[in-house]
């Protein structure tokens, strides 16, 4: 019976997946519409339709990109899950009442899809041209398709209000806040092949703009780009520090004020528990034997007065109590670390889940740093990373890391697992790195790949 209930519940959940995904995409489209109506007079989110500062526009554009990404992902889930559910549905003759309900449900789905299409049609691009300048700046231009359809908002009770007539907006060009060159340079060397190298032509154009008083690259545009870059840098550094500080602070607070007292109380109630694994027990015995042998040795050579058997046993007993207390505390610390790390991981996940806009900004910031490096610097970092983690001497480092992790969690050292991990994980890591070099870096920066190969040889 339990198995049948589980299967029935799973089937119900799967059958509702398309509608659930569509509802999430629909809510994201409503958010975009609300953003347009509240801050952009019902027009598209763009610097051309409202007068806002750089920081405000960056915030609005980050909100927009998050909603558009949500719509894209959830519509993909809707299409995929609907395909599976349609294949798994049995074909039986439909009752008239059920047929009417299904037709009404289908109409609501179509209305939601139409509304989503109306909203995102403003932000679908007809043409995107990208060029890389000598300082690795990125130029983006986009033509936006006009909105020629009516927008329909579906209420929560499933009723569809009459559509409002809207005048189609003329297509306008969207200027990204991270534009590094004017848009009239978009038709430069990206689509043409000339005698001179592209970087040389881009350098000449940049110098011409800097010395030409009538150039479109005005001081105001330069200041705007600088403010945007400074804003992105500040947000990125704050977010990276937040990712480090919040988990560490959570770990220390939960371990100190909650976990350690609970584990200590458990050990005090179970005094027979001294060692949490055999490795710690063997270490304690070795330490006790070493102390006893050192005591005999010092007594024989006259460093300490000659001790009787009772005095030796007394010293050994005191040392055993000291070792017992030490390893008991180590066990308490290890158990507390396990749960404190779980709380830290939860805190880290919460920060990630609630900071999607900051993640996009950090990604853009790190991409700018990475791709602004010279080819030699990129090759040096790749070689350093590979030699450190997948190189000839990396097994020793991985062994130290695995032993430290086992000690941190109070786990007994497993040599077989360590050897298996060292034999497989660096190979997987090396394969992923080579694929990244072949798939992405070779396309973005071929000269960096050539420099890497020359330096590696």
Curated annotation (Swiss-Prot):
The keyword Glycoprotein does not apply. One of its GO terms (cellular component) is plasma membrane. The chain crosses the membrane at residues 239-259, 332-352, 368-390, 417-437. Its main location: membrane. GO terms for molecular function: proton transmembrane transporter activity. It is found in: Cell inner membrane. The keyword Glycoprotein does not apply. It is a multi-pass membrane protein. InterPro entries: CemA (IPR004282). Keywords: Cell inner membrane, Cell membrane, Hydrogen ion transport, Ion transport, Membrane, Transmembrane, Transmembrane helix, Transport. Disulfide bonds: none annotated. Belongs to the CemA family. Required for H(+) efflux immediately after light irradiation to form a rapid H(+) concentration gradient across the thylakoid membranes. Together with PxcL, contributes to transient H(+) uptake following dark to light transition. This is Proton extrusion protein PxcA. The lineage of its organism: Bacteria, Bacillati, Cyanobacteriota, Cyanophyceae, Oscillatoriophycideae.
């Amino acid at each position: 019976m339990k198995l049948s209930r589980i299967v029935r519940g799973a089937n119900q959940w799967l059958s509702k997946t398309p509608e659930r995904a569509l509802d999430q995409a629909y809510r994201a489209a409503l958010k975009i519409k609300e953003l347009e109506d509240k801050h952009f007079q019902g027009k598209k989110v763009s610097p051309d339709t409202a007068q806002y500062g750089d920081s405000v526009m960056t915030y609005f554009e980050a909100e927009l990109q998050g909603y558009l990404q949500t719509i894209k992902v959830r519509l993909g889930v809707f299409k995929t899950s609907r395909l599976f559910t349609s294949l798994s549905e049995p074909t039986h003759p439909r009752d008239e009442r059920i047929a009417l309900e299904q037709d009404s449900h289908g109409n609501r789905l179509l209305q939601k899809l139409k509304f989503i299409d109306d909203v995102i049609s403003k932000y679908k691009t007809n043409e995107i041209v990208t060029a890389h300048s000598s300082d690795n700046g990125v130029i983006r231009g986009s033509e936006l398709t006009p909105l020629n359809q009516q927008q329909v908002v579906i209420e929560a009770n499933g009723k569809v209000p009459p559509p409002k007539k809207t005048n189609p907006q003329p297509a306008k060009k969207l200027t990204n806040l991270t534009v590094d060159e004017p848009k009239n340079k978009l038709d430069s060397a990206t689509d043409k092949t000339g005698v001179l190298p592209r970087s040389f032509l881009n350098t000449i154009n940049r110098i011409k703009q800097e010395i030409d008083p009538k150039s479109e690259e005005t001081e105001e545009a330069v200041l705007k780009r600088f403010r945007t870059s400074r804003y992105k840098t500040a947000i990125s550094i704050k977010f990276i520090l937040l990712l480090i500080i919040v988990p560490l602070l959570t770990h220390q607070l939960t371990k100190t004020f909650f976990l350690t007292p609970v584990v200590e109380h458990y050990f005090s109630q179970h005094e027979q528990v001294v060692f949490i694994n055999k490795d710690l027990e063997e270490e304690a015995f070795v330490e006790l034997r070493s102390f006893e042998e050192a005591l005999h040795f010092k007594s024989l050579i006259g460093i300490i007065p000659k001790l009787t058997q009772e005095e030796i046993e007394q010293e050994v007993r005191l040392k055993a109590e000291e070792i017992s207390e030490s390893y008991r505390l180590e066990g308490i610390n290890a158990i507390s670390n396990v749960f404190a790390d779980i709380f830290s991981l939860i805190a880290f996940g919460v920060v990630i889940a609630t900071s999607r806009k900051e993640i996009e900004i950090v990604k853009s910031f790190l991409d700018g740093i990475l791709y602004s490096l010279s080819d030699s610097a990129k090759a040096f970092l790749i070689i350093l990373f590979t030699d450190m983690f997948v190189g000839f001497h990396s097994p020793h480092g991985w062994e130290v890391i695995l032993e430290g992790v086992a000690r941190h969690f109070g786990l007994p050292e497993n040599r077989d697992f360590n050897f298996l991990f060292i034999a497989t994980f660096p190979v997987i890591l090396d394969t992923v790195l080579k694929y990244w070099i072949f798939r992405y870096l070779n396309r973005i920066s071929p000269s960096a790949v050539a420099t890497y190969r020359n330096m590696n040889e």
